[in-house]
């Protein structure tokens, strides 16, 4: 069936009746088919041929859900479907044993005996996630969208079937969706392995003779910049024109050299005005240039192009910006200004190279901004919903919720843009964080600041801080028990300007940079007064006094703003340290107005708030408990160490087996765990618990047939059923794990004497062996 807008094919020279004047042919309506069914090659077989808008990945998954979401299929059916599919093909079914959804993924042939891996889906009030993964998504479709771009815990990303990926319209996708489970065995399901054989061959480059180059025949020369794959506009052409001037012409056959005079402009065709030439697209202008001789690249050809931006626009701190202004400011140039004029091409080249280095970051930033502005994408829906929710009204723990949403959005953007951009992971994270701040925090900054100011004014925090500022300015350094002071306004004003920049910034990362610059100025002044040995004891009173003299009460709400919205990894570095110093100084100033507050120590409210903040923002420490650091000295390789995870309630026998496995001991029965304490070795019974061992001493894993062991056995025989070794450590309380890591010194020794073994242990400690005292 033909489309209404298409005409029938006629023999050469025949005229269609539809175009004869006065002839009216009765048009029969062409019914639009219910589905546009693509053929096996992915070409549309029916329907309108008009180009439609691009179908997003989320829309493809939503429409074709009956194909990949088979909740009634069992494990055998999933294996049968995925058996002939390429690696990465996926199905979602329902597990009969655990009564939850399962993601089945086809694995490569060389991955193992099983060609399908199953991953259980966990549903929680916060969303849905794969078992063992930390990424959580609102629904199943967004989860599949994310794993189409990233692997996370999967072996490889999830590709769409070829027919679904190449479908151009919603009707084609609906036709595929109508097949359901039968799609996998239909002719539409073409395998991706056939793609390399069907791909068209790349045409080989054809070399041209110098005569063809001189006459301008064939394809024109081109310049390609991999950093700007789609940007070959007039600005790039003008850049080359300014950098060097070479012309290839049909007038002379002399070697290429810079022309003495500017070349003439592009000739205008007869009957065409210059204004019409200016309105022509760049491709037609390029063709007209090639007809008279292609310039590589010429100068002043075609319409006038806008000049390149000066270095001042690229970098206002560049020392060459003043030279550009001086050379272009006056119409007449003196011999003194001629030297900067000759530097222009070099400076422009440096500017272009600098911009080229920054181009990938700008491309990533623009792509991330477009994704966040598009509500039809997963990250766009998340960001837009967040903006709407914050603007509606305040909620409890509002800043913490915004930080969690920013972390989720950054993970989704990293999965979307990571494989396509030439950026290392650490730079990609920084660029995405900056884009999120620009798209989310910049519009919400006035709202959040107003709510923080209202809350802190209601509970009296801002009033107490303002009163503390007044008392600190009145009492001077004596209010903090210090004699250091920045009395000169010349020294205080630079610090105040940095703090004002901090108040104007909307990004927590930028605010931390301004805070670090202000603290650097304070440390410089502190070293001038107190010497190079000045430390935190002198810095905190000086910071408090300078804050009082600057008189900026809004720093209180900015400190909370940064503490809650700053990226978690920055909280453990230098920025987190000085942010804590700022909070402590503000707490000291607020406590000056209270009679019960101590002048030289932070208030109890600060300690409580810092403890709650650390529990909320810093990584949890329960994951690092029950870890034992094991040191092992091999006579051939020397001292090595390993960290072993010992579950709670583990016995010495379990730990001995674990040590034998980790250190590949061939005779584990000949080794045992000993407690080295009070210049003696005490054999630990197998049934003893690891976490109830004393906190002092060394745990040594060594051979059991030692003189110390034999002597201990003799003493044990004499004393009957007494166990001096066990009594030595059972009397003490405590555990090895404590609040952090426990360390076990594991040592393998030969059949030396007891004194020799002690000396060897002391030598290990002197050589840096990681056998540390508990």
From Swiss-Prot:
Residues 624-706 form the Ras-associating domain. Residues 1-52, 188-211, 249-342, 704-774 are annotated as: Disordered. Residues 704-766 have a biased composition (Basic and acidic residues). It comes from the Eukaryota. Keywords: Acetylation, Cytoplasm, Cytoskeleton, Endocytosis, GTPase activation, Membrane, Methylation, Phosphoprotein, SH2 domain. Phosphorylated on tyrosine residues by ABL1 and ABL2. Phosphorylation at Ser-351 by PRKD1 induces interaction with 14-3-3 proteins. The modification N-acetylmethionine is found at residue 1. Its main location: cytoplasm. Residues 327-337 have a biased composition (Low complexity). The modification Phosphoserine is found at residues 16, 209, 257, 330, 334, 351, 609. The keyword Nucleotide-binding does not apply. Residues 456-598 form the VPS9 domain. One of its GO terms (molecular function) is guanyl-nucleotide exchange factor activity. One of its GO terms (biological process) is memory. It is found in: Cytoplasm; Membrane; Cytoplasm, Cytoskeleton. Residues 256-268 have a biased composition (Pro residues). GO terms for cellular component: cytoplasm; cytoskeleton; cytosol; dendrite; endocytic vesicle; neuronal cell body; plasma membrane. The modification Phosphotyrosine is found at residue 35. PROSITE patterns: RA, SH2, VPS9. The keyword Nucleus does not apply. Residues 68-162 form the SH2 domain. InterPro entries: RA_dom, RIN1_SH2, SH2, SH2_dom_sf, VPS9, Vps9-like, VPS9_dom_sf. Interacts with the GTP-bound form of Ras proteins (NRAS, HRAS and KRAS). This interaction prevents the association between RAF1 and Ras. Interacts with 14-3-3 proteins YWHAB, YWHAE and YWHAZ when phosphorylated on Ser-351. Interacts with the SH3 domain of ABL1 and ABL2. Interacts with RAB5A. The interaction with Ras is probably regulated and antagonized by the interaction with 14-3-3 proteins. The interaction with 14-3-3 proteins is regulated by phosphorylation on Ser-351. Belongs to the RIN (Ras interaction/interference) family. Ras effector protein, which may serve as an inhibitory modulator of neuronal plasticity in aversive memory formation. Can affect Ras signaling at different levels. First, by competing with RAF1 protein for binding to activated Ras. Second, by enhancing signaling from ABL1 and ABL2, which regulate cytoskeletal remodeling. Third, by activating RAB5A, possibly by functioning as a guanine nucleotide exchange factor (GEF) for RAB5A, by exchanging bound GDP for free GTP, and facilitating Ras-activated receptor endocytosis. This is Ras and Rab interactor 1.
């Amino acid at each position: 069936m033909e489309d209404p807008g298409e005409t029938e094919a006629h023999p050469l020279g025949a005229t269609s009746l539809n175009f004869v004047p006065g002839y009216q042919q009765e048009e029969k309506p062409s019914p639009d088919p219910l589905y546009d069914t693509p053929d096996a090659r992915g070409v549309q077989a029916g329907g309108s041929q008009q180009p439609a808008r691009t179908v997003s990945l989320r829309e493809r998954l939503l429409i074709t859900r009956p194909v990949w979401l088979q909740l009634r299929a069992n494990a055998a059916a999933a294996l049968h479907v995925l058996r002939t599919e390429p690696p990465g093909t996926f199905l979602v079914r329902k597990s009969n044993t655990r009564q939850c959804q399962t993601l089945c993924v086809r694995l490569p042939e060389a991955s193992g005996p099983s060609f399908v891996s199953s991953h259980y889906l966990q549903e929680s009030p916060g969303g849905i996630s794969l078992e063992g993964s930390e990424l959580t998504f609102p629904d199943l479709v967004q989860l599949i969208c994310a794993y189409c771009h990233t692997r996370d815990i999967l072996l490889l990303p999830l590709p769409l079937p070829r027919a679904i990926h190449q479908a151009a319209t919603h009707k084609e996708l609906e036709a595929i969706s109508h097949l359901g489970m039968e799609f996998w065995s239909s002719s539409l399901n073409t395998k991706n392995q056939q793609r390399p054989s069907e791909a068209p061959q790349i045409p080989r480059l054809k070399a041209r003779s110098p005569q063809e180059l001189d006459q301008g025949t064939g394809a024109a020369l081109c310049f390609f910049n991999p950093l700007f794959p789609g940007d070959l506009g007039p600005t790039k052409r003008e850049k080359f024109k300014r950098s060097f001037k070479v012309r290839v012409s049909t007038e002379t056959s002399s070697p290429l050299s810079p022309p003495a005079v500017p070349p003439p402009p592009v000739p205008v065709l007869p009957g065409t005005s210059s204004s019409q030439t200016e309105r022509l697209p760049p491709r037609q202008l390029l063709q007209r240039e090639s007809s008279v001789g292609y310039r590589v690249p010429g100068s002043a050809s075609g319409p006038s192009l806008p000049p390149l931006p000066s270095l001042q626009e690229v970098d206002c701190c560049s020392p060459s910006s003043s030279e550009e202004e001086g050379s272009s400011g006056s119409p007449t140039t003196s011999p003194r200004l001629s030297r900067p004029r000759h530097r222009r091409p070099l400076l422009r080249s440096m500017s272009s190279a600098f911009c080229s280095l920054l181009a990938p970051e700008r491309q990533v930033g623009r792509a991330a901004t477009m994704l966040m502005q598009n509500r039809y994408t997963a990250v766009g829906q998340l960001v837009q919903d967040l903006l709407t929710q914050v603007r509606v009204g305040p909620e409890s723990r509002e800043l913490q919720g915004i930080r969690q949403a920013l972390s989720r959005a950054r993970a989704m953007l990293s999965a979307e843009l990571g494989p396509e951009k030439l950026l290392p992971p650490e730079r990609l994270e920084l660029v995405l964080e900056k884009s999120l701040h620009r798209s989310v925090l910049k519009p919400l900054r006035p709202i959040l600041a107003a709510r923080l100011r209202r809350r802190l004014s209601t509970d009296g925090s801002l009033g107490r801080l303002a009163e503390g500022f007044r008392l600190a300015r009145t009492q001077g350094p004596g209010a903090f028990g210090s004699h250091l002071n920045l009395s000169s306004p010349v020294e205080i004003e630079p610090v105040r300007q940095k703090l004002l920049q901090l108040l104007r910034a909307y990004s927590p990362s930028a605010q931390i940079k301004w805070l670090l610059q202000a603290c650097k100025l304070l440390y410089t002044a502190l070293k001038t007064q107190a010497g190079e040995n000045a430390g935190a004891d002198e810095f905190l009173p000086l910071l408090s006094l300078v804050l009082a003299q600057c008189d900026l009460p809004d720093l209180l709400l900015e400190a909370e703003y940064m503490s809650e919205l700053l990226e978690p990894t920055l909280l453990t570095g230098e920025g987190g340290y000085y942010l804590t110093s700022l909070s402590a100084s503000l707490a000291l100033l607020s406590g000056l107005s209270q009679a019960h507050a101590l002048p030289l120590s932070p208030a109890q409210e600060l300690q409580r708030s810092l403890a709650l903040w650390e529990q909320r923002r810093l990584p949890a420490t329960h994951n690092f408990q029950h870890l034992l650091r094991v040191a092992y000295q091999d006579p051939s390789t020397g001292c090595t160490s390993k960290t072993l995870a010992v579950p709670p309630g583990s016995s010495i026998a379990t730990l001995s087996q674990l040590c034998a496995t980790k250190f590949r001991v061939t005779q584990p029965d000949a080794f045992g765990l000993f407690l080295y304490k009070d210049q003696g070795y005490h054999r630990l019974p197998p049934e003893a618990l690891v976490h109830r061992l004393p906190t002092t001493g060394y745990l040594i894993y060594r051979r059991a047939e030692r003189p110390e062991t034999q002597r201990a056995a003799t003493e044990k025989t004499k004393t009957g059923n007494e166990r001096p070794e066990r009594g030595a450590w059972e009397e003490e309380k405590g555990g090895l794990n404590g609040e952090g890591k426990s360390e076990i010194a594991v040592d393998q020794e030969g059949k030396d004497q007891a004194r020799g073994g002690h000396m060897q242990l002391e030598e290990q400690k002197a050589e840096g062996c990681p056998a540390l005292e508990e």
